[in-house]
A protein has these predicted regions:
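Internal, conserved structured core segments that host functional sites
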Residues: 64-67
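Active-site SXXK
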Residues: 1-25, 60, 180
Length: 220
């Protein structure tokens, strides 16, 4: 789930100098971090090639490629990533062994991107556009009518037999956009994805049948 703040940190750099998105990094392939992913990226960067930051953001956000993430993460000074967390007022417990974060805390990334409260409007829109291309059709997007825009990011974490599968996003409902965050624990990622899908469908239906109250900035 740290892919979203990593993306934000790079786009914050690009506010000052858009040329940073053309900076290139070389992937030597000595370590394949996608091997630990249960949900494999449909597309991933290839060993022996150079990629621009723009391309790496695409692989990291759209396909959840851990190798692209590693290149971007390792090129960020820790203080820059911490500045994102502090500047966005996200309740993040960095002292915990697993760097835990609450549903409310993580949803803060999406609230502030939607309202352009940390990045400027151009870069906030760029971030949301990347998130609408995320390749995880079996989660939140599966629970809403086809064609409904969803700007979302999923994440997984495995510890022993336990599987954690989470997804957060903005669903652009015809009545108004809303944030949805779902965290699951279990032993079968497929079943957990189905839970996310079913909850997404339930919430979409409830909003369709009701009259949601608009929150700040038009967000429900």
């Amino acid at each position: 789930m740290m892919k979203v703040p990593v993306m934000i940190a790079w786009l914050k750099r690009a506010e000052k100098d858009p040329r940073i998105l053309d900076r290139q990094f070389y992937y030597d392939g000595k370590e394949d971090l996608t091997a630990m992913q249960d949900i494999k990226p449909r597309r991933a960067i290839a060993a022996g090639r150079k990629y621009t930051v723009e391309e790496l953001l695409h692989y990291m956000v759209n396909y959840s490629d851990n190798n692209a993430t590693s290149l971007l993460y390792n090129a960020l000074p820790p203080q820059e990533l911490n500045a994102v967390l502090d500047g966005m007022d996200v309740d993040n417990d960095t002292s915990a062994g697993n760097n835990d974060i609450t549903v409310h805390g993580y949803s803060g990334f999406f609230r502030i991107l939607f309202n352009a409260g940390y990045l400027n409007r151009e870069m906030s829109e760029k971030a949301l556009q990347l998130l609408t291309l995320a390749d995880f059709p079996q989660g939140i997007a599966a629970g809403v009518p086809k064609g409904t825009p969803v700007a979302a990011k999923f994440g997984e974490f495995n510890q022993g037999e336990e599987r954690q599968l989470h997804e957060f996003g903005i669903v652009y409902h015809p009545k108004g956009p809303y944030i949805l965050g779902i965290m699951t624990r279990g032993r079968d990622a497929k079943i957990q994805a189905e839970v996310i899908r079913d909850l997404s469908a339930l919430i979409f239906t409830e909003i369709s049948n009701g009259s949601p109250v608009k929150g700040p900035g038009g967000m429900q």
